[in-house]
Amino acid sequence: MSWGGGMQILSELYPDSNIYGLDWDVSLLRIDPKNWSNMTIFEADQRDPTIIDKLPMLDFVTEDCSHQMPDSIATFEILEPKLNPGAVYVIEDVYPQFWDAYCADGRFDMYDVTHVKDRADDRLAVYTKPE
């Protein structure tokens, strides 16, 4: 979420939704969450299991943090209990060296969207919680 631009876009696109963000250093944000009434930002390590206590049930999560598979999977494991049935969890920028491991995990559908920006790290791991 670095810089906060993605949260700002989501806040504008979905003004009736509650948008929650997590960053390890909120001083890096280039937006002021006080200007967005539907936005709440937490400062924490993405692998901190206590963050779950601060969150409501969630319908959509996009994780674009450290880009390291162990961190991403740890975050998924922490947040998965907070996903409503049918909720979607997207891990962005899955590096090519982790592609096979996510596929082997079996919970994620994999999408290669490198054609969108012609960037090597534009691969998504997408989980949909069963109804």
Regions found by a protein language model. Name each.
Residues 1-51:
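SAM cofactor-binding core of SAM-dependent methyltransferases
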Residues 7, 55, 72-76:
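Conserved strand-to-helix beginnings and helix N-cap segments that scaffold or border functional pockets
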Residues 14-15, 56, 84:
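Short conserved AdoMet
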Residues 22, 62-63, 91-93:
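Active-site flanking residues adjacent to catalytic metal/cofactor-binding acidic residues
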Residues 32-35, 51-56, 102-106:
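Alpha-helix C-terminal capping segments
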Residues 40-43, 60, 71:
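Nucleotide-sugar donor-binding/catalytic module of glycosyltransferases
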Residues 52-68:
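A short acidic, Gly/Pro-enriched loop at the edge of an enzyme's catalytic core
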Residues 67-131:
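C-terminal substrate-binding/active-site "lid" region of AdoMet-derived donor-dependent transferases
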